[in-house]
């Protein structure tokens, strides 16, 4: 009876290991400090209303009033988890595109403002505001990681 019990336990342990290994492998790609930026994990995405105003003014070449810059920088600094700052800025950019009906092409967001220019301006807000972000684009300081992607 002892040998049969040992074989059964060994088989159960082996099955458990086979089940757990793929689950932990899949989770490891998505785990890290950035996982707390997911709204499903309780993160409240900041609307960054003053940053919207700043980027719109900058994109068409208008001077940005000091209070708009200060307020935008404060909004970004108020995102307590540094890992979430670029995610919230990306979310803001996508919502601006959606509100203006901008598609996936290289068109203007609004007269005088090209989509790729707006994207780079938004990605550079942390550098402009001198707020730290741990997930910078390769070879840059203060520029969000998604600035070089074609998705945003």
Swiss-Prot record:
Short name of any one Pfam family annotated for the protein? Tryp_alpha_amyl
Query: Per its UniProt record, what SMART domains does this chain match?
Result: AAI
GO cellular component assignments: extracellular region
Where does the source fall among the domains of life? Answer: Eukaryota
**Which tissues is this chain's protein expressed in?**
Endosperm.
A GO MF label = serine-type endopeptidase inhibitor activity
InterPro entries named among the record's database cross-references: Allergen/amylase_inhib_rice, Allergen/soft/tryp_amyl_inhib, Allergen/tryp_amyl_inhib_CS, Bifun_inhib/LTP/seed_sf, Bifunc_inhib/LTP/seed_store
Keywords in alphabetical order: Alpha-amylase inhibitor, Disulfide bond, Secreted, Signal
Principal place of residence? secreted
Write down the Gene3D superfamilies for this protein, in alphabetical order. Answer: Plant lipid-transfer and hydrophobic proteins
Signal sequence range: 1-30
User: Can you summarize the PTM annotation of this record?
Assistant: Five disulfide bonds, which are essential for the inhibitor activity, are probably present.
Compartment list = Secreted
- CDD domains, from UniProt? AAI_SS
Q: Which family does it belong to?
A: Belongs to the protease inhibitor I6 (cereal trypsin/alpha-amylase inhibitor) family.
Subunit notes for this chain? Homodimer.
Which purpose does this protein serve, as stated in its record?
Answer: Could be involved in insect defense mechanisms. Inhibits insect-type alpha-amylase.
Name the chain's protein: Alpha-amylase inhibitor BDAI-1
Which species is this record about?
Hordeum vulgare
């Amino acid at each position: 009876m002892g040998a049969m019990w040992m074989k059964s336990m060994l088989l159960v342990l082996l099955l458990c290991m086979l089940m757990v290994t793929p689950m932990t492998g899949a989770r490891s790609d998505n785990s890290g400090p950035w996982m707390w930026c997911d709204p499903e994990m309780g993160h409240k995405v900041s609307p960054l209303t003053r940053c919207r105003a700043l980027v719109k003014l900058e994109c068409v070449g208008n001077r940005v009033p000091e209070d708009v810059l200060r307020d935008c920088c404060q909004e970004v600094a108020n995102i307590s988890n540094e890992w979430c700052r670029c995610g919230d800025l990306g979310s803001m950019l996508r919502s601006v595109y959606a509100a203006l009906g901008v598609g996936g092409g290289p068109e203007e967001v609004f007269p005088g403002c090209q989509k790729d220019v707006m994207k780079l301006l938004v990605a550079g807000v942390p550098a402009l505001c001198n707020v730290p972000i741990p997930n910078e684009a390769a070879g840059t300081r203060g520029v969000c990681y998604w600035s070089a992607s074609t998705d945003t």
